[in-house]
Amino acid sequence: MSPKKLPKDPIYNRVRVLRAERDMTRIQLAELINVNPQTVGALERGDHSPSLDLAFRICEVFGLPVEAVFSRTEFAPMSKELY
């Protein structure tokens, strides 16, 4: 198996945190955004960058703007942002 090629400019996301806050499983989120649960897992691990359409669908589920869910720079822990 060849080594996985990581994107030059990774897209960081808060999908796992947002999903967990809502007690939502990967399967539930996958059904809402019309993808396989494996795709949700790959997004959460940073193994897959979403298309613009998929990013918008994810943000719609969480009721948040794109910049609150996805970023080119790593997110600070949410607790630091809230306090």
Residue ranges and their predicted role:
Residues 16, 27, 56:
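Residues within the helices of the helix-turn-helix
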Residues 53-68:
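DNA major-groove recognition helix of helix-turn-helix/homeodomain DNA-binding modules
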Residues 1-5, 60, 70-83:
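Short, charged recognition helix plus adjacent turn
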Residues 1-21:
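A short, Lys/Arg-rich alpha-helix, primarily the initiator
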Residues 26, 37, 47-48, 66:
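The DNA-contacting recognition helix of HTH DNA-binding domains
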Residues 20, 34, 45, 74:
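Residue-level detection of the helix-turn-helix DNA-binding "recognition helix"
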Residues 20, 31, 60:
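Alpha-helical residues within the helix-turn-helix
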Residues 23-42:
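Short alpha-helical DNA-recognition segment
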